[in-house]
A protein has these predicted regions:
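Juxtamembrane inter-helical linkers in multi-pass membrane proteins
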Residues: 167-183
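Alpha-helical transmembrane segments
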Residues: 142-158
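Alpha-helical transmembrane segments of helical membrane proteins, especially in multi-pass transport
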Residues: 157-165, 181-212
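Transmembrane alpha-helical segments and their cytosolic interface motifs
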Residues: 103-136, 198-199
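Hydrophobic alpha-helical transmembrane segments and immediately flanking/interface helices
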Residues: 96-103, 210-236
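Final/C-terminal transmembrane alpha-helix of multipass membrane proteins
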Residues: 241-259
Length: 259
């Protein structure tokens, strides 16, 4: 029996306790961030529970070599770091040659960074903010507005970390297939467009509540947002979210003037 087959469970899944420790450590992946290794130390810290399964355990040579290898420079989006943690842990437990792991590790960081930035910072975060802003515009109390934002945003990245760790370990060196998942490939465009549509209603409603002094035509605002949705469904990928948002806001301003 090879060392790889002795180390990796037959089901290609981690024991529940190890998986849970790795998942919880993902929330501290940026805890040792620095300009020299960026997320490197955090990646090694998150992988460490799985590396204990290597032959010799924590006192073995493969454990110390793997830990040192992954504590070096690495950069990715922190919410998608679980993909790298799972895939690299699987590669180590499978006994993949160190040189191949290094090449794989180098190639993995860039895609995880760019996809994460577009999905989270440019799409999911604005969407959650605008949903909370819309709730404020409809009269929700400030504490409820804060709760709506925190719950919606945190549910998203809690799920993303868990998904990344699971799919990374399942796929191993073939994790590139997972990066073609519709959530990662089309998610930024869909979420970004939804954020643009919600902005057309949330911003005027919230502004009116803050400024006051005039009647709010909530039905008309919602109608314009629905018109934007129809336009997006009609033109699909040819219509960018930010252009649609500007068009809706322009229609709203024009309607307010002629009203």
């Amino acid at each position: 029996m090879t060392t790889a087959s002795a180390a990796v469970p037959a089901s290609t899944s981690l024991p529940t306790g190890i998986w849970l420790r790795m998942y919880l450590r993902l929330f501290a992946v940026q805890g040792s961030w620095n300009y020299e290794s960026l997320l490197g130390n955090g990646i090694a810290f998150c992988m460490e529970p799985a590396l204990r399964l290597l032959p010799g355990g924590m006192t073995g040579q493969r454990y110390s070599e793997a830990l040192g290898r992954h504590a070096r420079y690495f950069n990715a989006h922190p919410y998608l770091a679980g993909v790298a943690v799972g895939a690299l842990a699987r590669a180590e437990l499978d006994g993949v040659p160190p040189a191949m792991i290094e090449r794989f590790r180098t190639a993995l960081g860039g895609p995880l960074g760019s996809v994460g930035d577009r999905l989270v910072w440019a799409s999911w975060l604005p969407l959650c903010s605008l949903i909370a802003l819309g709730a404020f515009g409809f009269g929700a109390r400030p504490i409820l507005v804060i709760a709506i934002f925190l719950v919606s945003y945190n549910l998203g990245h809690f799920w993303l970390r868990a998904w990344g760790l699971r799919v990374g370990f399942q796929k191993g060196l073939r994790v590139a297939d997972a990066l073609g998942n519709p959530v990662l490939r089309k998610g930024p465009q869909v979420v970004g467009t939804a954020a643009a549509l919600i902005a057309g209603a949330a911003i005027p409603l919230a502004s009116s509540r803050l400024i006051g002094g005039g009647r709010v035509f909530a039905a008309e605002i919602i109608l314009l947002a629905m018109v934007g949705g129809v336009l997006f469904a009609r033109f699909g990928g040819r219509l960018e979210g930010w252009r649609l948002s500007l068009a809706i806001l322009a229609l709203l301003v024009l309607f307010s003037v002629i009203r």
